[in-house]
Amino acid sequence: MNLETVAKVDPEIVAAVRGELQRQRTHLELIASENFVSQAVMEAYSCVLTNKYAEGYPGKRYYGGCEWADVVENLARERAKALFGAEHANVQPHSGSQANTAVYLAVLNPGDKALGMNLAHGGHLTHGSPVSLSGKYYNFCFYGVDAKTGRIDYDAVARIAREERPRLIVAGASAYPRVIDFARFREIADEVGALLMVDMAHIAGLVAAGIHPNPVPYAHFVTTTTHKTMRGPRGGIILTTREYARDIDKAVFPGVQGGPLMHVIAAKAVALKEAMLPEFKRYQEQIVTNARTLADALMGYGFNLVSGGTDNHLMLVDLRNKNITGREAEDILASVQITVNKNAIPFDPQKPSVTSGIRLGTAALTSRGMDADAMVQVARAIDLALSYGPDEKKLEEARGIVAELCRAFPLYQELD
């Protein structure tokens, strides 16, 4: 990572960047929404396309000099369409939240009714939370998970849809560890005359590799981020049919955004090409293997997992039987250099700033090359940190496990 020029201009920023690199190298990253991009993605992200304004779309720009921007955006669009089997792709959204907002703008009027997953049950802020624009401008009602199984109750979803008659149904989640039945969601949407949007931000990499069912054949709109399991830059994509292509494009620009970030779109294109390689499928398979191994090992140590395990890259740990909160667990694990996020569990008695659980994901550790055997060690370190109270010897043992794993699976050696 060549920061010589930056160091001459702004040594404070260089110190922070180098500190962050050291943190990433020496900590176990278990936040489910984080990952480590490739060197190729990182280089594309920092290219000269950051200088180019390109309002509009390829062939229909509002600025001159966009011939190479058009090449880059067309490559990204065509790769997204090919990877997921979509008829149309918009690669301009700056984030998953922007992508979701654009879909709402395209098909809803303020006050229209929509049905989404309850944030407290694993949904996302942009699926109608009252603190989000989505909840302020649209009339969202909610479905959730069954109290006993921790899984989506599709019969309850259908019942709510019949009662509420939403214009749009939103499927997808930010903290749901099980396969989502998109075909069932489409049946429900068709029954009540609703459109279906799927937010696959967390599982897009698994979908691209054929490990999780693809929502594209079932949904009118599919949104995703390009980071998380996709291992690309931070950004968003919308996939849709030809029927809604124009509406979506107008909703993104000029609806919710101005000029696209062309350097980010270049990095998206690189990540999409990487996702087409055979090794990407093997990588995604290892993510799921690692998640299941970590889940099983944690349950072996007496941790309770929402829904009893995982089908994808993430798991929700219910800490109530350990007599600690999610916030306390996050802080304790940080002290042994394991990074997680506190997370509400379904029917959580704690407030969102405290929570009764933590969310764990295996995408970033898998990017470092860690395998199932390493996950057993990760589970051991988590148990040492959380199951024995303030025991400094146990915490030091956990730190030793973390340090050894970080040495055995180094990160970004090429950046030295």
From Swiss-Prot:
Gene3D superfamilies found in the cross-reference section: Aspartate Aminotransferase, domain 1 (3.90.1150.10), Type I PLP-dependent aspartate aminotransferase-like (Major domain) (3.40.640.10)
Task: Identify which cofactors the protein needs according to its UniProt entry.
Answer: pyridoxal 5'-phosphate
Assembly mode: Homodimer.
Q: Which reaction does it catalyse?
A: (6R)-5,10-methylene-5,6,7,8-tetrahydrofolate + glycine + H2O = (6S)-5,6,7,8-tetrahydrofolate + L-serine
Family in the record: Belongs to the SHMT family.
**Which positions bear N6-(pyridoxal phosphate)lysine?**
K228
Q: Positions of the site: Plays an important role in substrate specificity?
A: H227
Could you say which residues bind (6S)-5,6,7,8-tetrahydrofolate here?
A: L119, G123, H124, L125
According to UniProt, this protein's pathway is: One-carbon metabolism; tetrahydrofolate interconversion; Amino-acid biosynthesis; glycine biosynthesis; glycine from L-serine: step 1/1
GO process annotations (BP): glycine biosynthetic process from serine; tetrahydrofolate interconversion
Q: Which organism does this sequence originate in?
A: Moorella thermoacetica (strain ATCC 39073 / JCM 9320)
Q: Which gene encodes it?
A: glyA
Keywords for the protein's UniProt record, in alphabetical order: Amino-acid biosynthesis, Cytoplasm, One-carbon metabolism, Pyridoxal phosphate, Transferase
GO CC term, one of those recorded: cytosol
Q: Which GO terms describe its molecular function?
A: glycine hydroxymethyltransferase activity; pyridoxal phosphate binding
Q: What does this protein do?
A: Catalyzes the reversible interconversion of serine and glycine with tetrahydrofolate (THF) serving as the one-carbon carrier. This reaction serves as the major source of one-carbon groups required for the biosynthesis of purines, thymidylate, methionine, and other important biomolecules. Also exhibits THF-independent aldolase activity toward beta-hydroxyamino acids, producing glycine and aldehydes, via a retro-aldol mechanism.
CDD domains noted in UniProt: SHMT
Q: What is its EC number?
A: 2.1.2.1
Q: What is this protein called?
A: Serine hydroxymethyltransferase
